Amino acid sequence: MARVKGGVVSRKRRKRVLKLAKGYYGAKHILFRTAKEQVMNSYYYAYRDRRQKKRDFRKLWITRINAAARLNGLSYSQLMHGLKLAEIEVNRKMLADLAVNDAAAFTALADAAKAKLGK
């Protein structure tokens, strides 16, 4: 049976990892072992933070809606409850966009919520 030499395969595998580690700081883009560890961590961070990003944006939208609602004399929870009572289905992303870019439209929604709350 012939002896198998894995030089080509090993070199290809190492090159692939080092290519993924391009731009990393210090030894992490030069040494194979540290590069491999960092690439594995990077995949983990990417996976985790794709989920975290959704939570972060929701927090940002709620903060913006709350700030705009308080300018109209409501708290965030009162505004959301009033909109639900008024059967106005607008998601938080759209509400936050209105709060930042179209204050008049947001005020109209806040007034509709106030009317349903009896304020």
Curated annotation (Swiss-Prot):
Keywords tagged on the record: Ribonucleoprotein, Ribosomal protein, RNA-binding, rRNA-binding
CDD domains hit by this protein: Ribosomal_L20
GO biological process: ribosomal large subunit assembly; translation
Any Gene Ontology CC annotation: ribosome
Alphabetical list of Pfam families matching this protein: Ribosomal_L20
Any one Gene Ontology molecular-function term assigned to this protein's record: structural constituent of ribosome
Domain of life the protein comes from: Bacteria
PANTHER family: 39S RIBOSOMAL PROTEIN L20
Family: Belongs to the bacterial ribosomal protein bL20 family.
Function in brief: Binds directly to 23S ribosomal RNA and is necessary for the in vitro assembly process of the 50S ribosomal subunit. It is not involved in the protein synthesizing functions of that subunit.
Protein's name according to its UniProt entry: Large ribosomal subunit protein bL20
Gene: rplT
